[in-house]
A protein has these predicted regions:
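Active-site microenvironments that recognize anionic phosphate/pyrophosphate groups
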Residues: 1-161, 167-238, 246, 268-272, ...
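Extended C-terminal subregions enriched in glycine
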Residues: 250-268
Length: 338
């Protein structure tokens, strides 16, 4: 299995994992109903019955059918719990790429996307994600759980059926570590959470896209991608695993409305989506959790790759204006307002 290596100088990580780049060659989609044998057995399958959601899982000789959300271990994992126990220090730093890699299939319908499923279905998906997140943090060797989406041909996915990846790590990913350290420093220096500060600035401002009762979506002041946007709780909150069903329903509404608006405003857009969550086991590394969406509308140049300076062809204010109109229309249709 793979190993996690670090840059000679920077806290930049690479997972060397040949098993995670296998091409899907079958004409059958392994995530569609009826093809459950093409994946690992489900650890959790949500099944609607008599108006209730049942939590089931595959057995040794049978597969759960009529599911609405399905979770299983990836057959092409980026990390593994059976990695060789080998370490080396800098300049050739290496450690086992230890962890769990789960796939959460968001809908039984192959043609559905995260921009078209119902708000209720989004809620079901997030309930499952929250369930797996809580379980993962009870496991030895799990320091952080990343939750991300690759949508579209340019996103890095090799299976188009809508799904969410959950990948755990034994160390903090560099971006989360840097974000946590910066948040902690600003909190100590200014006495305010930087995400709360950003939220207060962006509410009703020129970069706001949409807001619901408990969440706001906005294009960040210094985006890395054209049409990039973030979704964050209005109230200070560091734990996604503890949010209530009401909050799950609310964030599902704004996710569905903004992704629906994005895909209508930017035709055939691929995107990546990442949950930036606190590491549950490190109280000194807490962050105001939020979701970041990165539309892929072009290619990075040497400026971005070589220097970390991002060139944007549209201002976040203009992007928010266009996305806001599309997302408000999407929200109105979702809540039954014409």
């Amino acid at each position: 299995m793979g190993n996690l290596r670090k840059d000679y100088i920077l806290e930049r990580s690479s997972i060397i994992s040949p098993s995670s780049v296998k091409k899907h060659n079958s004409k059958k989609c392994p995530y569609c109903p009826g093809n459950e044998s093409m994946t690992n057995p489900s650890l959790l399958s949500l099944v609607a019955k008599d108006g209730m959601l049942q939590r089931l899982q595959d057995g040794e000789d049978f597969f759960v059918t009529d599911w609405s959300v399905r979770v299983f271990e990836s057959k092409e994992p980026a990390v593994s719990t059976s990695t060789p126990n080998t370490y080396s220090d800098r300049p050739l730093y290496s450690e086992p790429a230890y962890g769990y890699h789960y796939v959460v299939v968001a809908s039984p319908n192959h043609k559905d996307s995260l921009a078209t499923i119902s708000v209720e279905q989004w809620s079901n998906v997030l309930v499952v994600v929250q369930d797996r997140l809580r379980w993962l943090y009870t496991q030895k060797g799990v320091t952080y759980v990343s939750i991300f989406v690759n949508h579209g041909k340019e996103s890095g996915t090799n299976i188009q059926h809508s799904h969410i990846n959950m990948v755990s790590f034994s160390t903090l990913p560099p971006i989360i570590e840097a974000e946590a350290e910066a948040s902690h420093r600003i909190l100590n220096e200014k006495g305010v959470c930087p995400m709360c500060q950003a939220k207060d600035v962006e509410i009703a401002g020129p970069r706001q896209i949409l807001q619901t009762e408990g969440f706001i979506a906005f294009c960040p002041w210094a985006p890395s991608y054209p049409f990039e946007f973030w979704i964050c709780p209005k109230k200070h909150n560091t734990s996604f695993s503890k949010i209530t069903q009401k909050e799950i329903n609310d964030v599902s509404l704004i996710l569905r409305a903004t992704l629906g608006g994005l895909t209508k405003e930017v035709k055939d857009v691929s995107f990546n989506l990442a949950f930036h969550l606190s590491p549950e086991k490190k109280n000194s590394k807490q962050i105001h959790w939020h979701i970041e969406v990165y539309p892929i509308t072009g290619h990075w140049s040497g400026l971005e790759r070589g220097y970390g300076v991002f060139l944007n062809t549209i201002s976040p204010e203009k992007a928010a204006e266009a996305l806001g109109a599309a997302c408000r229309k999407e929200l109105a249709s979702l809540v039954g307002i014409e």
